[in-house]
Structure formats: C-alpha cells, structure tokens
C-alpha cells in the first residue's frame, strides 16, 4: 500500500492525472512527463531525448507509475484478483482476466549498474512502495559456491538446473519451502531492492536470490532488466517473460538500434558443429549404458522394485530418449555436410575487401531445410539439445572438461536465433498476437533484412558462418506481436533522431528533442578547423601526416593550458590514439626544446590513458581523479564507444572539457559495416521501399555522430555543471545542425586553435569563483566516498563466510589483507603520512615511500633504499579480512632496519638508486595481458608465502628484462625488506643494467 504521508510535489499533467514528483519539476521535466502520459493514453510509442542532468529517469518512472496507478484505480477488482493469484503467475490466471490487467512496466537499461541507479532514483520517489523486482543472471545472483566457481554463464545455468532438479541446492530448497506470506514479509520493505539487496537477503536467510527475484517478477508491477532479456528471443524464452499488455521502457536507448540488430543475428563455426556431434555421441553412449544397467538391475530384482528403478532412471534423464538423440545427430551430420557444400557453391559471392563470401539470408534457410531443419521441429530439437547438455553436465566425474556441452549449446542458440527472430507481416494482418513459430518465419522477409557471410580459415579449413540482421525494426515488431502495449525509448543522445525513429519502425505518437533545464546552457562548443600548420582533417589517410599529427598536438596543448581541473579527450579508435600518442612521444614540441609533445602535455596536466582491459580501468580512474584534485588538473585519453564514453559518471571537476579528436566512423573494413552498407545500397535500388530510406553514407555518418554525441554528454551531468566541448576536426564544420543534440546547437562556433584557446580561457575566467568552490567540494566528496567505500569493504569482509579470497591486482600492494610485522622503532621520526582520500579506488603505489626516503637522506641515515611505507612493512600473508584486521593504524616511526654488510646507499649503483625510486604504480603500465597474469600469480604466491624471493626473481625476469630492466629492479619494492636486499644483490650479480 502507498504511504499516507507525502513530501512530494503534486504535478497535474492533464485534468485526469497528477504525478507525485520528489521536487518542483523544471519545465523540461513537465514536457517530458506530458509526452509520456499522452502516448500511454493513446496506446502509442515514444522517442524521448532529454539532456543529461534533466532528471530523465525520475521523469520516466514517476509519469509511467502514476499512469499505471490510475489504471489500477479504474480496475481495482481485476488487479486485486491478479495479485492474489499466487506464485503460479500468468500460467495460473484465466486469459480473459489477464487481458484486463493493468500494464506491467518492463524497465530496461544496458547494464546492471545502470539499473541499480534506477533503483536508487525510484527510492527517492513516492512510488518506491510499488512491487518491484530486478532480473539478472546467476552470475550476479547465485550464492551457491558450486555454481559461483563456474565462469561460463551457460554452464552455471545447467549446473544450477541439475542441482535444483536433484534437490541438492540448500538455498533453492529453503526458498521452495518458504510460504507466500513469509516471502512477502522478506521482500515487502516499503522500497525497491537492487541485486545487492537480494543477495544480502538471500545470504542472511539461506534463500536463493535468483529464484526469489524471478518468482517476484510473476506478480511485480515494475520489472527492471537488461536490454537483451527483452530483445533476445532466446532470453525471453528462458525467463518466460509475459509481455502481453505491458509497457516497455528502454532507457539509454542510443545504442538500441545496433543492439537489436546484434540480438537478431547469429554465428556458428564448423568447429562447434563438429564438437556438437562428438558431444551427442558421448551422450548416446552414456545413455545406452545407463539404460542397459537399469534393465539388468531391474531383471535381478522383483517386479515392483525393478519398475521403480526403471522409473528412477527415466526421471533422471527426464525426456531424453535415444531415438530423439539419433534423429538430432543425423540432422547435425547433414548440417555439417550442407555448410561445406554451401561455401563452394555459386550462390555465395566475394565481397571485397573481405576475405569471405556473402549472400542474402534466404540462402541460409534453404541450406538448413536441406539438412532437415524447419520451423515446425526446431523447438523440439533445441529442447533435446538442452536436455542432453544437462545430462552431460550431471556426469561430472565421468566426462572430460572438454565435453561439457559447448558445441550443443552453440548449435542450439544458432538455430533458435534463426527460427524465432523474424516476424511475418501476415501475423499482424490476421490480428494474432501469439503466432506459432512456423508462421513467424518468412524467407522473403529474411532475405530483405539479413545477409549471410561465410569465411574459411586458410590454415585449418574452419568455416565461420555469420548471419547478420540489418533491420532493428524486426526486433521491435516482434515485441509488438507479443502484445507489448507501449514502447518508450529514452536517452540523453538520440540525435540524429529522425533516422533513429525511422529505423526503429515503431508507431511513434511522440518524438521529443527536449531543451535543457537551463535556458542558457553553460557550455561553450568550439569546432577547431585549423591549427598552426594547416587544416585539421583527421581522415584515415591523414593520420600519419606529420603536419596533421603535430597540428593536433599543438592545438591540444593550447587548450589544455587554459582548461582547469579535468579534461576528457576522446579519439576515434584505440589505433588512432596509439598512433598519435606514439608520434607525440618522439616528436619535439619546439625547435628550441628537447621535450617531446607528450612530455610537454605531462607537465601541463597529469595524463592518463584508458586501458583496453576492463579490469585495469579502476586503477586508471584513480590516477585521473587524483590528478584532477592537483593544482594543474588531469587529462584522460579515451576512445569513443569505449569504457569511458558512457557508463561512468564524470561530474563537475572531472569533466570541465570534452575534446574529440577526429570523427569516430565505424571501421570501414569491418564485416558488419561492409555488409550493412551493401544491404542499404541494395534497399536504395529497390522500387518497393519507402521514400525516407537511408543511404549507406547517411547511416555511416549517423553512426559516427551518435558516438560523438554520447561522448559530448559527459560534459554536463546536472543543472549546476558547466564546461566546454572542443571538436578538433575540420569536417565537423560541414555537419548539419540536426546531427547534434538540440540543446547543444546554439552553443557551437568555429575557430582556429588560437581563437578556441582565447574563448575557452575567457569562459573559465568568468566562472573562476565556481571553479574554486568546486575544488573544495570535490576534495570533500572524494574523501566522503573513500570513507564510505572502506566501510563497505570492511563490512563485506567481516560478513564473508568464505575461506578463499580473490586477490586483484589492485589489492596486491594494499595493506588491507597483510599482517603487520613487528619491528623495533628508531628514535628519529619521519613526517606523518596521511592516506590519500581522493578516490574510492585503491591503486598500488609507493609514492609515500619516496617521501620517507627523502626524510632519511636529510637525516643522514645510511641504508639501502627507503624505509617501507605501511604497505611494505607488512608480511605478505593472506588472511580472511575480519574486524580485527580491517583497520590498521599507520605508524609514524620507520622500523629499525637489519644491518646489510654488502650493500649500502653508497655502494648501490646510481642506475639502481634511480630505478627503486620508480613508483610501483608504473609496474603494470603497458604490460601485456599474459605478463599481467604471470605477474599477478607470482605476487599472490609470494604473499601467501608459497614461493621464495628467488623464485619471484626468476619469474619476473622474463617479464621485464631486457627492455624494462629498470622496472625489474623497481619490483624489489614489492618484496619484504629482508628479501628486497637479496633481490637487488642477485640483480647486480646477474649484471642486469638499465
């Protein structure tokens, strides 16, 4: 029931409906909510663009939930009957009553972290009491260690199902035994729960969080879930989503078109087909043996007991029969043969510059039909494959690790994608919302909207079959055919919106390009067309032109010098970023200086680069946030469509400027890009297509500007934020205004490098007092977040029941899991070291150790290297963190060092002295993934005292020597003090020089 008291503002959207909003809404929020309510009333769809910082998520939630509550008031009896129909959900409810339900809201976003933010926003509103759940995979929800330790999500699912069917999962059994009233008591706390809340509740009460969330979805009014759970027909089937009479919201929908196409596409290799055949043979052999054993035992027993044993065997293998397996195996054999024939046939044509061959999608259906597959039988065939996988996984001791059903899984997914994605126009014409699978597949529709691409590996003859869907509207039509009432697409950056709405193929009743909350948007946008050496056209051909590369560097330096705090610099691709940075590192920025452009940039700002590996991002983010709080600020070099361009919130000081170098066009030789352009060119040549059809060049440009607009969105995160946008490429000047978000268009001007720097400098000088205030607030905010983060880590550690800890690279040098080594205290006291609180992240570092070294030198202490910081004073013993070890006091006195006879500060070579001053945060920089794994494994073993220092020496040496010998010597800083001396001595004896 809704709470009686209210601190919300009542906003009347129309004479019949008021919305309870957490505060007095801005005009842009009123407009947004009015558009939502209008399309809900008219049973239409909407595309809603509203700038970041305008409360888009709040507006979506409040307006939609208010509309649904009004529907409940008009149909109270029907709704009450539905909610009290029990855990059986839709399957136990009469269809006539079901059609009278008020709509269920499915709120989809790209990632679980974005959904957690939606939960946070929902709990700020008057509607937090609405029955809500969040769906996710076992990877996020499961608390059973047997399942959690499995990395592959598909195997997790099969193992979980096996444990559940055998009643071997304690958490599921307790969940299954829980009464409806007791479950309601657990879950109805008056506000929405995110994944972390479900997991915590499940852990505390030994209840399965995964099945709790799924069961709650049967009667929930609001269901939060990732995009692909709605779009992907395989996921809809797996989670049994009932979309009839529902409202589907896609938040952050700017990537939805490509996601729809991707989820309607499929891929299969000849290797997977061959593996599927071997796995089916294995299942057949095991099944025959098991049936023979059961019959033999049954013959030896009495009739009654024998029947019982045979029944038990049948229960264990469920519906799996040898006859079905033989039929499936025969078809997979035929599939392998037909695919080989297809590659050599004239139906496939070469597609320069690609190495493979392509055709319309209809050819694939014809090939599958020759192998014995059709829409009538494919679902049963997929069920047999799924049962075979579960059976194979149940034989853990009898089956090799390589025979766990991967081949069968991939073949099943491929077939399901092909036969359950494409909707036939006649289905809508006859008014059937639930159409048989056979009626959903129309070869002509497939041919018009898909391309088949097959590539053969020259070395091993492996075939790769790729089935590309190039029409996002197919996925949207499928949703509508399943009875979806409304589809709402929302984002901060849908522009260019006309092309977006055309490609989605929905019945739009509202297309909104919303203004910003502020009439005067506090953003300065500059298109830099020229540098000192000429035009800045960042085409692929121009990328290696030295005048262009140095021109960009000069322009970048000019604006970096006048922009305070943090700058986000986006490149078109990783390859472009790597090439430019490499040239900047070797090119002098001035004829009168020996400094390179890169060295000059590093003097201007602390410069950090977005890593390719996701697990390294936290450490890089820390270095950036630390730099932002410094006097000169920091610059983060990143890539459009990368990890930094969306999904991470850079507020205020962290994004005073967004600079985009070049235009991020999709890779011209990418398979999907080449075939998509071919598909669009084919459409342009047809007479039966609409006049608004999109050319391949228009699509190519639209894809680039959508990535640009998403990166631009980083600059303004709320109404009090401000910053500049610098588009560093001549070609932006010729772009149509509608390619940019509406709120940005009036802020755009053109200039050369000097003009841009002058305008930018003036912009920030006018806001000098705001910048000074933000510096103080930023430091306070970071300190608060850091404190909160540490408390969470300590609580999680003390609640943990596991004996095994996963050690990350970030933890390796941190003191949280290390035992303090007791040593004598010297009389001299170095300066008090204050732990950094500039970020919530933890990074391996020995910068404070270097401060102590300086203190030692000033006090004439003759010993090797620095007295270690707390992170180096501890023995590297891994412990399960608990209350007694979660907080360690920093000592101001350095421990007394053991006397070293062979090495002193005076006898250590200068090159070694310089090397051991390298911060430990530099050790992982530019290291390959394989070397990082080796480095991590070695350090874990050393910290656990399972290997000695000399083994560390041998393992580290090939990682760093000969190219990075200075870093190899710097690795001594991660060892215990007594081992550090031995390590350095051995390095000297081995004649390792920097």
Curated annotation (Swiss-Prot):
Keywords: 4Fe-4S, ATP-binding, DNA damage, DNA repair, DNA-binding, Helicase, Hydrolase, Iron, Iron-sulfur, Isomerase, Metal-binding, Nucleotide-binding, Nucleus
Listed name of the protein: Regulator of telomere elongation helicase 1 homolog
Residues covered by the Helicase ATP-binding domain: 15-300
Top-rank lineage group of the source organism: Eukaryota
Cellular compartments per GO CC: nucleus
GO terms of molecular function: 4 iron, 4 sulfur cluster binding; ATP binding; ATP hydrolysis activity; DNA binding; DNA helicase activity; DNA polymerase binding; metal ion binding
Residues annotated as binding ATP: 50-57
């Amino acid at each position: 029931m809704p709470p009686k008291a209210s601190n919300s503002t009542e906003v009347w959207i129309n004479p019949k409906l008021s919305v309870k909003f957490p505060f007095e809404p801005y005009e842009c929020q009123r407009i947004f909510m009015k558009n939502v309510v209008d399309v809900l009333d008219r049973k239409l769809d909407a595309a809603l663009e509203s700038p970041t910082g305008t409360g888009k998520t709040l507006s979506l939630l409040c307006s939609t939930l208010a509309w649904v509550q009004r529907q409940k008031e008009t149909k109270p009896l029907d709704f009450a009957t539905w909610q009290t129909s029990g855990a059986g959900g839709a399957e136990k409810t009469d269809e006539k009553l079901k059609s009278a339900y008020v709509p269920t809201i499915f709120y989809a976003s790209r990632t679980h972290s974005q959904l957690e933010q939606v939960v946070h926003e929902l709990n700020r509103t008057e509607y937090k009491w609405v029955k809500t759940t969040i769906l996710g995979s076992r990877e996020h929800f499961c608390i059973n260690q047997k399942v959690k330790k499995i990395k592959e999500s598909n195997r997790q699912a099969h193992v979980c199902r096996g444990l559940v069917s055998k009643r071997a999962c304690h958490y599921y059994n307790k969940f299954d035994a829980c009464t409806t009233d007791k479950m309601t008591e657990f879950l109805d706390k008056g506000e929405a729960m995110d994944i972390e809340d479900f997991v915590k509740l499940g852990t505390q009460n030994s209840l399965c969080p995964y099945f709790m969330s799924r069961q709650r979805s049967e009667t929930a009014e609001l269901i939060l879930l990732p995009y692909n759970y709605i779009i992907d027909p395989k996921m809809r089937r797996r989670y049994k989503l009932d979309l009839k009479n529902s409202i589907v919201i896609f938040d952050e929908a700017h990537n939805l078109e490509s996601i729809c196409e991707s989820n309607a596409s499929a891929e299969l290799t000849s290797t997977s087909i061959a593996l599927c055949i071997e796995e089916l043979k294995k299942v057949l052999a095991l099944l025959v043996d098991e049936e023979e054993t059961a019959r033999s035992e049954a013959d030896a027993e009495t009739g009654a007991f024998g029947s019982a044993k045979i029944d038990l065997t049948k229960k264990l293998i469920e519906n799996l029969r040898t006859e079905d397996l033989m039929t499936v195996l025969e078809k997979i054999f035929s599939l392998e043969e037909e695919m080989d024939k297809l590659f050599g046939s004239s139906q496939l044509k070469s597609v320069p510059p690609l190495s493979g061959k392509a055709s319309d999608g209809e050819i694939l259906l014809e090939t599958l039909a020759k192998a014995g597959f059709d829409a009538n039988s494919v679902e049963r065939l997929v069920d047999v494959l799924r049962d075979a996988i579960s059976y194979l996984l149940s034989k853990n001791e009898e089956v090799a690790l390589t025979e766990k059903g991967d081949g069968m899984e991939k073949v099943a997914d491929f077939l399901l994608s092909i036969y359950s994605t494409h909707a036939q126009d006649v289905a809508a014409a006859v008014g059937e919302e639930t159409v048989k699978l056979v009626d959903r597949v129309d070869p002509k529709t497939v041919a018009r909207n898909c391309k088949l691409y097959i590539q053969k590996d020259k070395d091993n003859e492996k075939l790769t079959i790729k089935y590309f869907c190039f029409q996002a509207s197919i996925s949207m039509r499928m949703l509508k055919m399943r009875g979806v009432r409304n589809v709402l697409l929302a984002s901060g950056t849908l522009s260019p919106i006309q092309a977006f709405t055309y490609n989605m193929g929905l019945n739009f009743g509202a297309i909104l390009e919303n203004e910003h909350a502020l009439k005067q948007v506090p953003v300065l946008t500059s298109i830099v067309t020229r540098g000192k050496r000429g035009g800045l056209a960042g085409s692929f051909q121009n990328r290696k032109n030295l005048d262009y590369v140095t021109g960009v560097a000069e322009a970048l330096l000019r604006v970096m010098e006048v922009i305070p705090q943090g700058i986000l610099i986006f490149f078109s691709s990783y390859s472009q970023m790597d090439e430019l940075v490499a040239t900047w590192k070797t090119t002098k920025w001035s004829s009168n200086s020996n400094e390179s452009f890169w060295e000059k940039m590093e003097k201007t700002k602390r410069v950090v680069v977005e890593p390719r590996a996701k697990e390294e991002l936290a450490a890089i983010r820390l270095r950036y946030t630390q730099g932002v709080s410094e006097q000169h600020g920091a610059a983060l070099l990143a890539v459009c469509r990368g990890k930094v361009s969306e999904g991470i919130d850079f507020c205020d000081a962290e994004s005073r400027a967004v600079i985009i170098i070049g235009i991020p066009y999709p890779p011209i030789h990418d398979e999907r890009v080449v075939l998509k352009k071919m598909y669009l060119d084919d459409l342009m040549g047809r007479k039966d297509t609409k006049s608004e059809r999109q050319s391949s060049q228009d699509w190519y440009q639209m894809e680039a500007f959508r990535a640009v607009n998403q990166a631009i969105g980083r600059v303004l995160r709320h109404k009090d934020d401000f910053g500049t946008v610098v588009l560093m490429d001549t070609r932006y000047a010729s772009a149509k205004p509608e390619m940019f978000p509406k709120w940005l268009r009036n802020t755009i001007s053109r200039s050369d490098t000097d003009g841009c720097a002058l305008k930018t400098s003036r912009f920030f000088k006018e806001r000098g007092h705001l910048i000074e205030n933000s510096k103080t607030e930023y430091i306070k905010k970071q300190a608060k977040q850091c404190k909160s983060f540490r408390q969470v880590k300590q609580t999680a550690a003390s609640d943990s029941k596991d004996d095994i800890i996963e050690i990350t690279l970030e933890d390796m040098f941190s003191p949280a899991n290390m035992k303090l080594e007791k040593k004598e205290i010297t009389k001299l006291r170095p300066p008090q070291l204050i732990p950094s609180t500039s970020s919530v992240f933890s990074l391996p570092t020995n910068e404070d150790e270097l401060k102590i070294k300086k203190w030692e030198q000033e006090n004439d202490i003759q010993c090797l290297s620095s007295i270690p910081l707390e992170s180096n004073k501890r023995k590297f013993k891994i412990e399960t963190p608990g209350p007694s070890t979660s907080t360690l006091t920093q000592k101001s006195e350095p421990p007394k060092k053991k006397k070293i006879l062979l090495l002193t500060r005076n006898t250590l070579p200068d090159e070694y002295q310089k090397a051991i001053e390298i911060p430990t945060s530099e050790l992982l920089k530019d290291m390959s993934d394989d070397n990082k794994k080796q480095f991590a494994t070695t350090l874990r073993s050393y910290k656990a005292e399972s290997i000695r220092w000399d083994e560390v020496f041998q393992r580290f040496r090939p990682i760093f020597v000969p190219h990075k010998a200075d870093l190899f010597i710097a690795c001594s800083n991660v060892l215990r003090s007594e081992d550090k001396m031995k390590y350095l001595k051995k390095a000297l004896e081995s004649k390792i020089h920097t």
